[in-house]
């Protein structure tokens, strides 16, 4: 179940799944669907608000700041990425590849430094734990005991 960028609801179901089962599933997830439609609307609004100059400024800030934050937390955690890149990703703040390359969206710079540091620690933790298991979150918590509060900051619409 997903909500696309153009605000359409997409449902994937096994071949042969009865239409009634699909309809019932969608109806039972109406609240979730409405919440995610609103999130997509916020993202679309943000996209329209960011002009080229502001995007350029955010990219420059990300390129200057994020490698420094990665270096700082890499030393603390003993986890070192193969590379650090800045992207234009709109639906995720960061990612860590199977080869331990870390990418961060320049949009992360719209959030408070505490939230930025959480994303850095989160992605570095993926170097050791490639999933979101209990061990992964224990590792994140070891280096950032208040990560849950920091994570909540990312759920709010950023200040432009």
Per-segment meaning from a language model:
Residues 123:
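Walker B catalytic acidic pair
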Residues 1-118, 127-160:
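Active-site-proximal or metal-binding-adjacent scaffold patches in catalytic folds
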